[in-house]
Amino acid sequence: MAEFKSKLNKGHAFTSKCASLVKEQRARLYILRRCATMLCCWYIQGDE
């Protein structure tokens, strides 16, 4: 039974680590998208 619990904890740690990495990447993409949108808006407004 102890082996099962240790495997379960390792699986949970892996899942938790993956979830945190996905969350970090989503935050980075969100920031990049906001910056790109802002730069495009400034570029378009500068033409007028």
Swiss-Prot record:
Small polypeptide acting as a regulatory molecule which coordinates cellular responses required for differentiation, growth and development, probably by restricting polar cell proliferation in lateral organs and coordinating socket cell recruitment and differentiation at trichome sites. The keyword Zinc-finger does not apply. Keywords: Cell membrane, Developmental protein, Membrane, Transmembrane, Transmembrane helix. The gene is DVL22. It comes from the Eukaryota. The chain crosses the membrane at residues 7-23. PANTHER family: DVL19-RELATED-RELATED. Belongs to the DVL/RTFL small polypeptides family. It is a single-pass membrane protein. InterPro entries: DVL, DVL_RTFL_regulatory. This is Small polypeptide DEVIL 22. It is found in: Cell membrane. It comes from Arabidopsis thaliana (Mouse-ear cress).
